[in-house]
Amino acid sequence: MLDTQIQELIIKWQKYLSLQKNYSNHTLISYNNDLKHFLEFMNYYNSDIVTMDYIKAADIRLMRSWLAKRKCDNFVTSSIARGLSAIKNFYKFLEKTAELHNHVVFSIKSPKKSKLLPKALSEEEVNISLDHIEEYGNSQWIEIRNKALLVLIYASGLRISEALSITKLHLQNLEFIKIMGKGSKERVIPWLAIARNLITEYLEKLPYELKDDEPIFRGKQGKKLQPPVFNRELIKLKRFYGLPEHLSAHSFRHSFASHLLENGADLRSIQELLGHKSLSTTQSYTKTSIKHLETAYVTAHPIKK
């Protein structure tokens, strides 16, 4: 089905995503399956073994036929969009390593998502975002800054304004961060090793000297990074990878709460982590699946005991 050169390039691409881009296993498996499906379709479409010539010659008709096939195979919109992202990623890799250029592939727009999507992102969408956010930045320190900031927001449920106000003084404790939130209300939030390590790496690469009480996240001119600047990076990310329109820095705070709830955390704990005054705010803030609510109801209602 595939000639030897294509097989070798796929192996190199997989190693690149794993070792250099540090993609999660979940994304690696998904992307590999998406590319496999695409190449199998190309083999069927051309009735011939897939070669570099066929890869280079992929046109609008082939791409649209493949996307239509995915839809007929009952792939959901997010999976179709992810598949297109995987193919674009592979072609981007081929541009760098094999000098193969195909502008048609990059011109294909991802399928639009429903306007009624909840504000939280799915775990898959979060994984894609964390894996790809480093691709947006004109220098290495900005790339690692973007990832460190996004991981911190999602790992700790911070508001973008809170994350951008963090200084070296906040980072002295290896297990907790003290945050001054809305209404000058201080809260203590655990932070994960992955966030600590990324911030440490970012500070090592940061080309500007900082005082201990200065915010650590800086713009390219060395000034304090502003929310609109970071959100512009996220806009590039969601457009290229077909992620939901509501994706923003704040949607990762929503996702933090939603995913904790779906994995068994109680609302009171989430309320404390988010810094909400009332529990009702937390309830409306999180995305709770019907299945989760149904399970909680059946398990907890006294009449069922």
From Swiss-Prot:
**Organism domain of life:** Bacteria
Kindly list any coiled-coil regions of this protein: none
Gene3D superfamilies given for it?
A: 1.10.150.130, Intergrase catalytic core
Where the record annotates domain Core-binding (CB), the positions are 4-95
Tell me the keywords, alphabetical order: Cell cycle, Cell division, Chromosome partition, Cytoplasm, DNA integration, DNA recombination, DNA-binding
**Which part of the chain is the Tyr recombinase domain?**
116-298
Q: What is its main location?
A: cytoplasm
Cellular localization per UniProt: Cytoplasm
Q: Where is the active site?
A: R159, K182, H250, R253, H276, Y285
Q: Name one GO biological process term.
A: cell division
| InterPro entries, per the entry | CB, DNA_brk_join_enz, Integrase-like_cat_sf, Integrase_catalytic, Integrase_recombinase_N, Integrase_SAM-like_N, Tyrosine_recombinase_XerC/XerD, Tyrosine_recombinase_XerCD
Any single GO molecular-function term of the entry would be: DNA binding
Cellular component terms (Gene Ontology): cytoplasm
Summary of the function given for this chain in its UniProt record:
Site-specific tyrosine recombinase, which acts by catalyzing the cutting and rejoining of the recombining DNA molecules. The XerC-XerD complex is essential to convert dimers of the bacterial chromosome into monomers to permit their segregation at cell division. It also contributes to the segregational stability of plasmids.
Q: How does this polypeptide assemble, per the annotation?
A: Forms a cyclic heterotetrameric complex composed of two molecules of XerC and two molecules of XerD.
Name the family the entry cites. Belongs to the 'phage' integrase family. XerC subfamily.
Put simply, this protein is called: Tyrosine recombinase XerC
